[in-house]
Amino acid sequence: MGSRPWALGLFCCCSSCFCLCCSRHRPVSRLAAVVGGAAAVPAVVSGVTGLILSPSQSPIFIQPTPSPRMSPLRPGLDLVFANPSDHSAPLGATRPSAPPLPHVVDLPQLGPRR
């Protein structure tokens, strides 16, 4: 076909690119990598926040995700931010309706086994 699928940083069949460590596979923007059947773990690689996946035999699809500054609010969240409620408490304040915390019980220290 002649075209290199990794040229745009969107698709790669390299079995080791899950680590996103080489310059060929390191996109400029934030990442979301998706591999069939692999569990995603949040991580920071070379200053890029994204999802790092466990190695897999299946191809790895890397899709840039919008940065928080540019992403629009989810439907419904704009209503929450547009109409602050009267009962909202300042940051760090406790709500009187919250249940009390359980008492802490000190356990006796165990001595070294003989």
From Swiss-Prot:
The lineage of its organism: Viruses, Riboviria, Orthornavirae, Kitrinoviricota, Alsuviricetes. Residues 72-114 are annotated as: Homodimerization, and interaction with host AMBP/bikunin. Residues 85-114 are annotated as: Disordered. The modification Phosphoserine is found at S71. Residues 6-24, 33-53 are annotated as: Hydrophobic. This is Protein ORF3. The keyword Lipoprotein applies. Residues 48-72 are annotated as: Interaction with the capsid protein. It is a lipid-anchor. Small multifunctional phosphoprotein involved in virion morphogenesis, egress and counteracting host innate immunity. Plays critical roles in the final steps of viral release by interacting with host TSG101, a member of the vacuolar protein-sorting pathway and using other cellular host proteins involved in vesicle formation pathway. Also acts as a viroporin and forms ion conductive pores allowing viral particle release. Impairs the generation of type I interferon by down-regulating host TLR3 and TLR7 as well as their downstream signaling pathways. The viral particles present in feces and bile are non-enveloped, while those in circulating blood and culture supernatants are covered with a cellular membrane (quasi-enveloped). Forms homooligomers. Interacts with host SRC, HCK, FYN, PIK3R3 and GRB2 (via SH3 domain); binding does not activate the kinases. Interacts with host AMBP/bikunin and AMBP/alpha-1-microglobulin peptides. Interacts with host HPX/hemopexin. Interacts (when phosphorylated) with capsid protein ORF2. Interacts with host TSG101; this interaction plays a role in viral release from the host cell. Interacts with host SIRPA; this interaction down-regulates the phosphorylation of host IRF3.
